[in-house]
From Swiss-Prot:
Its EC number(s): 2.4.2.18
Pathway info: Amino-acid biosynthesis; L-tryptophan biosynthesis; L-tryptophan from chorismate: step 2/5
Disulphides: none
Domain of life: Bacteria
Entry's family note: Belongs to the anthranilate phosphoribosyltransferase family.
Underlying gene: trpD
Essential cofactor(s): Mg(2+)
Name of protein: Anthranilate phosphoribosyltransferase
GO terms for biological process, alphabetical: L-tryptophan biosynthetic process
Entry GO MF terms: anthranilate phosphoribosyltransferase activity; magnesium ion binding
Keyword check for Transport: no
Keyword flag Transferase: yes
């Protein structure tokens, strides 16, 4: 039951068109511990949606839920996390997930913080499970898997259980809310580097500013021709947080990345099992060029962000070489055969 004191905090926030980050932390913290009735959660989410999410809304909510979350027992220094908002409706193969595996095979430290499918046929957890990559590891075993392979998957509900307090309301509302952009910001490892794909480009600049507020050293927010990843079917909008704190924005095409343009229909996938088959085909050299290139340009951004490449184009070329010479296929074969649950 919402207390009078908590209700007063909520009302002040609902009446404030320009809240501060600190005020947002204050209003979202009761939600993380179940102090709001569902009707008050709905009022908060609907108000923010109606007036439009602000930098303070997103940064403050992220800080509140990170404070309530369970951290992963690995320092974030040198670690990269990558996730997208989803919701683009494209139902592509799991491009960002595949790119994460390429990056790990290439020596980057990658944490994939994600969930099962919400708006598509296959979420990151669905395809990784079909690739025999462990999902249900406790923190100690997940750390062991990470140290052995440079990669681990952190199942979002296990590390951010406070999100569950808002789930009934989100399901009942059946409209996008601030939580649709919040999830990727809540990485339990507090990574130094992060790439986030957004389905709605209007969030690009704001989310890059949020990454700066959350202490990321470098970050990329991308929107690729209607999808929440770097596109090989069209032009990608990029917002880049540089190491000195400057934020720049630009566009990049498949041709500038050094790959052929394709149609979005060439990238349509299926469920987790089908997308895992596509992933293996990419890595063993039997898959379509469009699939390989889509994974490579997104992995290339990871190499660029971690200063392993001087440009997105150079990063793409490096990712393609790792796929073409069998490095990624060998990496996957090695680590799917080891049982990290014991």
């Amino acid at each position: 039951m919402t207390s009078d004191e908590t209700l007063a905090v909520l009302i002040r926030y609902l009446d404030n068109p320009n809240p501060t980050v600190e005020e947002a932390v204050e209003v979202f913290t009761p939600m993380t511990i179940g102090e709001y009735d569902d009707v008050h959660i709905a009022a908060l989410l609907a108000t923010i949606r109606t007036r439009g999410e602000t930098f303070a809304d997103i940064a403050g909510a992220a800080k509140a839920f990170l404070n309530a979350g369970r951290p992963f027992p690995v320092p974030g220094t040198g670690v990269l996390d990558t996730a997208g908002t989803g919701g683009d409706g494209a139902n592509t193969i799991n491009i960002t997930t595949g790119a994460s595996l390429v990056a790990a095979a290439g020596g980057l430290k990658v944490v994939k913080h994600g969930n099962r499918s919400v708006s598509s046929k296959s979420g990151s957890a669905d395809v990784l499970e079909a690739l025999n990559i462990p999902l249900d590891l406790d923190p100690e075993r997940a750390q062991r898997w990470f140290e052995a392979s440079n990669f681990t998957f952190l199942f979002a509900p296990a590390y951010n259980p406070a999100i569950a307090h808002a789930q009934p309301v989100r399901k009942a509302l059946k409209v996008p809310t601030i939580f649709n952009v919040l999830g990727p910001l809540l990485s339990p490892v507090r990574p130094e580097f992060q790439i986030m794909g957004v389905a709605n480009p209007r969030h690009g600049q704001m989310l890059t500013e949020v990454f700066r507020e959350l202490g990321r050293t470098r970050a990329l927010v991308v929107h690729g021709a209607g999808t929440d990843e770097i596109a090989v079917h069209g032009t990608t909008q990029v917002w880049e947080l540089k190491a000195d704190g400057e934020i720049i924005s630009y566009e990049i095409t498949p041709e500038e990345l050094g790959v052929e343009r394709c149609d979005l229909t060439d990238l349509v996938g299926g469920d987790g099992v089908e997308n895992a088959r596509h992933m293996r085909a990419i890595f063993d050299g039997t898959g379509p060029a469009a699939h390989r290139n889509a994974v490579a340009v997104n992995a290339g951004a990871m190499f660029y962000l971690n200063s392993q490449a001087d440009s997105l184009r150079e990063g793409t070329a490096h990712a393609l070489s790792l796929i073409n010479d069998g490095t990624v296929a060998d990496w996957l074969k090695t680590h799917e055969e080891i049982d990290y649950r014991g």
